[in-house]
């Protein structure tokens, strides 16, 4: 079986109006992919930017996959949350990006968005917090369902990813 090693980090985020940010992340693959080592999902620590608007997380990602086919290439899905002084968490944005398919190091910028909801939900978000959230996480990367949503742009999550490919030549795939 061909193997893919994804090694890197979620560096941080910029462009969010909220402070005290953290990121929940996960990786989604097709049925032909098997996770050999690493964890499929995780969460960063909370960071409050002191200078500028960059929240730094430097959260490690280390995944090792085996695959029988290229369908369902791995993609990272991200949820950025903010935490207020009372410890309440509110969604700041959803985003996703495909893991690059070429070996080497890659700097990825993942734009985020959040659902707007009705004007009442927007007003409640401004004064009380909270706001609408997706019921199913796969809507983040499923374009068919996403087009019906009214959304607002969030910030950008920055990732540094290193990719190693092994035994792809045995299966006729040139990298």
UniProtKB/Swiss-Prot annotation:
Tissue: Highest expression in thymus and skeletal muscle. Also expressed in spleen, kidney, lung, heart, microglia and liver. Detected in brain (at protein level).
Knockout consequences: Mice expressing reduced levels of the protein in the central nervous system and kidney develop perinatal triventricular hydrocephaly, polycystic kidney disease, lack functional intact cilia and die at the time of weaning.
Gene Ontology MF, one: gamma-tubulin binding
First-listed, main subcellular location of the protein, grouped into a coarse class: cytoplasm
Domain of life: Eukaryota
Entry-linked Pfam families: B9-C2
Signal peptide: none
Residue ranges of domain C2 B9-type in the record: 2-118
One BP annotation, GO: cilium assembly
Gene Ontology CC terms, in alphabetical order: centrosome; ciliary basal body; cytoplasm; membrane; MKS complex; nucleus
Record key words, sorted: Cell projection, Cilium, Cilium biogenesis/degradation, Cytoplasm, Cytoskeleton, Nucleus
Compartments it resides in: Cytoplasm, Cytoskeleton, Cilium basal body; Cytoplasm, Cytoskeleton, Cilium axoneme; Nucleus
InterPro entries hit by this protein: C2_B9-type_dom
SUBUNIT field: Part of the tectonic-like complex (also named B9 complex). Interacts with TUBG1.
Summary of the function given for this chain in its UniProt record: Component of the tectonic-like complex, a complex localized at the transition zone of primary cilia and acting as a barrier that prevents diffusion of transmembrane proteins between the cilia and plasma membranes.
Family: Belongs to the B9D family.
Protein name stated in the entry: B9 domain-containing protein 2
Source species of the chain: Mus musculus (Mouse)
